[in-house]
Amino acid sequence: MAQVQAQSLPTITPESPPRLEVRRISKRFGGLQALKDVNLTHEGGILGLIGPNGAGKTTLFNIISGFLKPTEGVVIFDGQTIHKRRPHQIVELGIARTFQIVKPFGDMTVRENTISGLGMPIYPRWQALVQRYRTPDTLHASDAIMALTDLTAWAETRADSLPIGLQRRLEIARALATGPRLLLLDEPAAGLTASEAEELAQLIRTLNAQGISIIVIEHNMTFAMGLCHRIVVLAQGEIIAQGSPDQVRHDERVINAYLGQEDADA
């Protein structure tokens, strides 16, 4: 196993954030066109990816993180083509991801879940090896990550006994343990109260201030508009609008495609 460094988070100067390029990405599932000619660049800051259900947001995340291969197009991260790589290889390059459905290792403590993230690039089935690698280095690194994510008080608590707000923090802690330069967050505010969502938003801002680029999929428009520096809107697999939160909020295409659906569902 590669030696785990006590300093687990990357040191990135504001002048050199990682660059993600999505070039002409399309994805078809049989006759269904999930993504069509999507072009996207993200370099630093917090980017929000919003859109109605079925717009292709999670499909795009799955392609960036290696869980799906595109039908057409390429994904480039800091000059390296990554769209043909496996998920653990993409983690090794510095891209980590959380999922909308929270899946901590329920029979393990918060600390053990965090340590599992430290081994993710090398051992995809790390949970079976956690006890073996409870070393001073991993314990020190997990302490730092739990302090950053405000989970120290629950270090020895089983993950499956945590409320949803703390489980979402734990998902981020596990992702941080891999030392990401780019963090993909899929619906991080889902199921949270307004106060819990604001606390989580503050954590995300802190991570970004430390040099981690972040892309957030979010259905909560208030959360996304208050958090993100730039918003990209997907509808029917295509980007229909992008810009600052204020620009997107007043874009008729967004109102018709996204807010209109919310009104119809109300």
What does each of the following model-derived ranges do?
Residues 2-266:
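Glycine-rich phosphate-binding loops of nucleotide-dependent enzymes
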